[in-house]
Amino acid sequence: NAYTTKEETLVYSVFPSGNMERAVELISDLVMNSVFPEKELEKEREVVLEEIHSYLDTPSEAIYDDFEDMIFSGNSLGHNILGTEECLSRMGTEECRRYLKSLYVPENMVLFAVGSIAEDKMFRLAERYFSPMHHTLVRNPRVPVTMSPVFSEVKSIDSHQAHTVVGVPTFGMHDNRKYALLLLNNMLGGPGMNSR
């Protein structure tokens, strides 16, 4: 299984502890040897295009992408994680391979294991299955986030509902005050009955 956020990709596996070596081998194979056949890319492209259309048809979801696009204008954090139709149409086998080889390198990776496995065994497995990786890290320096000045935007759509987003800059994720902020966020806009 895998998922992607705006800043990371996670490939993971859940398995009986006796199968740890096989799981590490499979994950390393995915990361190091993916071939991206054009036929499979086309199938996946259609799935993602459908996700994009579904998302755009759901104003309660799309409003967050619109908001992030405005507040992080000019920064990749403002981009929709699914991409755009235009971007997807340009992605082919070679583009996927280049992306994988430039970013999926040991300097950018963390191998993490939890469960019934000895630490020394995990290190041996990591060495065995990940040491053949190439080390051609392409530096993509982080673009500093510059928040847009105060703004207000109204977007009219054909809907029976209205949606709003209010956001303010806060402190970084390593600041200890984040826990109070998480509590406040849940109280103001948490799921269902939690919000005030």
Task: Give short role names for the model-derived ranges.
Residues 1-138, 144, 154, 164-165, ...:
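Charge-rich, well-structured scaffold segments of protease-associated domains
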Residues 148-157:
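Short amphipathic
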Residues 185-188:
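Generic hydrophobic alpha-helical scaffold/packing signal
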Residues 190-196:
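Short, intrinsically disordered, charge-balanced linker/junction segments flanking boundaries
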